């Protein structure tokens, strides 16, 4: 949530900052601003409410702001309403200290009151202005430089932050600090960059540093020095980003979301190939030994949003194949309920960004109880990846659309791979079954590609027909219920249509009272053992007036006797059907949103990476 960029070098800063903020739009925002300084002059600050184009118009696409050092920000309101006044950057009255900030300062009211007693006044309702003036207070009181002032502020502040600060007395330099909020430092030839995520850096450099918690950085042109909170210089590893820069561009597609839907075959294939070697799944890079796998008594999967849905699917696969009890939890609940974690357990955290605040807190809670942790993440070097005991990297590449598609698909595959390998190591499946499952996994990329080729136009037509629906319900049983949850989320988050997913067996326990004439019900039935029971549930809603869309496996053509619109997925092992069943549901959500003329990639009120509670 929110986005920070920074630049110091020999080029004009403002156009680079604007371009960087554009690549962070997916994180969600309601206002934006820039601060740029030219040599020793005080920074010029320009802000705008609304979309980034308003800021671009104010600054003539950055050309009106002269200077080669600057910071920029897209704000998601947490303290103070969305307004130009509350937008970042924030500064002291004389602009001697200017800063942008992501995160939440929990004790900002207490600090604000003390600063008022010291003669400070405030023009905004934000916690960020409080941080700026606290830094200024320490800077002037102790007269010991920016690092000292920022370190003192860090010790005073409670909460989360990624801070980028410019001081009038230090031209062409930017100072940064971090606590539980993402910040990446890029280094090029004679220039340095700051960003909340990788995409803004890719056009300029692939050499980056990941700044850690309670650490500070000092950026010069092409040079960065890092310090701990005691202001002692520390060494950081320079990491090379392997992502393809073109992956963060639309590449001729109308939206990032449809591009990323079409990138799923490659993302799934790359993730499979990263661990399947010589006909076997190799988890040595994840650090999971066979002895650890054999000793497991329970697995906890903890995640948020779509990652949680991927975890629910993984639960079905792991329990059925490996016979290990699995509990799936929402991270926002897990972290606050004082969970009882058994010995010989494994806590698996799933997060695309590796920075999700609740998931990170859940990881730390598990570690504090001495339970081994594993991260399934898409971003190399992210906080969750760095802090987990074991790491399984998905290879989805940069995902820009707020509504996840390819990252979710790779999370599904990661869950399958763990389930299959755990079963193999523990001897709960035969060698023949292991080989069959591996073969089925490796067919998934081509099957997803075929689905995209065969069904896109039919689903586009159907989506246009139901673009004005008021309510849509998704139903399924077993692993199909996990797919139903993801399909419902995809629809509601980008089309703003009220949608819910229900376990089909629960319909008669209350939900069926919501079914009325013409309401759309999407039924997923890919499990042979549950097929007839699902048909019965579908007949129940149809006789109450529902319009039925059925999604099933090729060969189940008798479904057309019950449904009004049928979609078929290729045959695969039933443990892996979510990877195929979700694709038509992604397309449905996408085309409904397009038909309504909505902003598919940046739906209202949502952020790609939720880094605050």
Language model regions located:
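Conserved short alpha-helical segments that host acidic/polar catalytic motifs at enzyme active sites
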Residues: 1-250, 254, 263-297, 336, ...
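Hydrophobic alpha-helical scaffolding
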Residues: 7-10, 101, 121, 125, ...
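Glycine-rich oxoanion-binding loops at beta->alpha junctions
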Residues: 68, 72-85, 275-290, 314-350, ...
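Catalytic-loop motifs flanking and including active-site residues across diverse enzymes
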Residues: 127-130, 310, 314, 410-414, ...
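Generic C-terminus detector
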Residues: 231, 547, 562, 572-613
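Glycine-rich phosphate-binding loops that contact phosphosugars or nucleotide phosphates
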Residues: 294-436, 440-443, 524-567, 588, ...
């Amino acid at each position: 949530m929110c986005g920070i960029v920074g630049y110091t070098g020999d080029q004009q800063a403002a156009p680079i900052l604007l371009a960087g903020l554009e690549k962070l739009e997916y994180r969600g925002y309601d206002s934006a601003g820039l601060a740029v300084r030219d040599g020793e002059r005080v920074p010029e600050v320009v802000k705008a409410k609304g979309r980034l184009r308003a800021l671009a118009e104010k600054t003539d696409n950055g050309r009106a702001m002269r200077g080669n050092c600057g910071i920029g920000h897209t704000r998601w309101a947490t303290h103070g309403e969305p307004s130009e006044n509350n937008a970042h950057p924030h500064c002291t009255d004389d602009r001697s200290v200017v800063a942008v900030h992501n995160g939440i300062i929990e004790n900002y009211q207490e600090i604000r009151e003390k600063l008022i007693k010291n003669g400070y006044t405030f023009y905004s309702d934000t916690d960020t202005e409080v941080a700026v003036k606290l830094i200024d207070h320490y800077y002037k009181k102790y007269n010991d430089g920016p690092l000292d002032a920022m370190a003192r502020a860090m010790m005073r502040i409670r909460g989360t932050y990624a801070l980028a600060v410019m001081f009038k007395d230090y031209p062409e330099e930017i100072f940064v600090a971090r606590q539980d909020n993402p910040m990446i430092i890029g280094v090029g030839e004679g220039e340095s960059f700051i960003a909340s995520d990788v995409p803004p850096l890719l056009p300029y450099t692939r050499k980056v540093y990941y700044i850690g918690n309670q650490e500070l950085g000092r950026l010069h042109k092409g040079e960065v020095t890092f310090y701990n909170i005691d202001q002692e210089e520390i060494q950081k590893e320079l990491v090379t980003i392997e992502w393809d820069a073109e992956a963060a561009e639309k590449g001729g597609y109308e939206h990032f979301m449809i591009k990323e839907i079409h990138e799923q075959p490659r993302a799934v294939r790359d993730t499979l190939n990263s661990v399947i070697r010589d006909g076997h799944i190799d988890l040595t890079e994840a650090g999971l030994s066979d002895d650890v796998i054999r000793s497991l008594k329970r697995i906890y999967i903890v995640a948020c949003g779509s990652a949680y849905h991927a975890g629910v699917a993984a639960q079905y696969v792991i329990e059925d194949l490996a016979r290990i009890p699995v509990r799936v939890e929402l991270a926002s609940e897990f972290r606050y309920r004082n969970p009882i974690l058994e010995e010989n357990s494994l806590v698996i955290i799933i997060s695309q960004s590796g920075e999700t605040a609740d998931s990170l807190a859940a990881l730390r809670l598990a570690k504090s109880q001495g339970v081994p942790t594993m991260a399934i993440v898409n971003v190399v070097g992210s906080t969750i990846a760095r802090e987990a005991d074991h790491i399984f990297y998905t290879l989805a590449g940069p995902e820009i659309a707020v509504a996840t598609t390819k990252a979710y698909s790779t999370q599904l595959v990661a869950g399958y791979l763990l389930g299959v390998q755990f079963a193999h190591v523990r001897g709960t499946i035969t060698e023949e079954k292991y080989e069959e499952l591996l073969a089925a996994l490796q067919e998934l990329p081509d099957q997803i590609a075929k689905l995209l080729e065969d069904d896109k136009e039919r689903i586009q037509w159907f989506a246009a027909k139901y673009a004005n629906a008021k309510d849509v319900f998704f139903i399924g049983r077993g692993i199909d219920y996990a797919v139903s949850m993801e399909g419902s989320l995809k629809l509601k988050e980008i089309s703003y249509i009220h949608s819910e997913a229900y376990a089909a067996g629960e319909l008669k326990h209350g939900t069926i009272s919501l079914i009325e004439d013409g309401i759309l019900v999407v039924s997923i039935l890919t499990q042979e053992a549950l097929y007839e029971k699902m048909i019965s549930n579908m007949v129940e809603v149809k006789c109450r007036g529902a319009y039925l869309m059925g999604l099933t496996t090729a060969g189940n053509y008798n479904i057309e006797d019950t449904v009004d619109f049928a979609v078929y997925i290729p045959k695969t092992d039933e443990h892996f059907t979510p990877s195929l069943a979700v694709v038509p549901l992604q397309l449905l959500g996408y085309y409904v949103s397009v038909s309504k003329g909505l902003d598919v990639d940046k739906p209202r009120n949502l952020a790609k990476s939720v880094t605050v509670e």
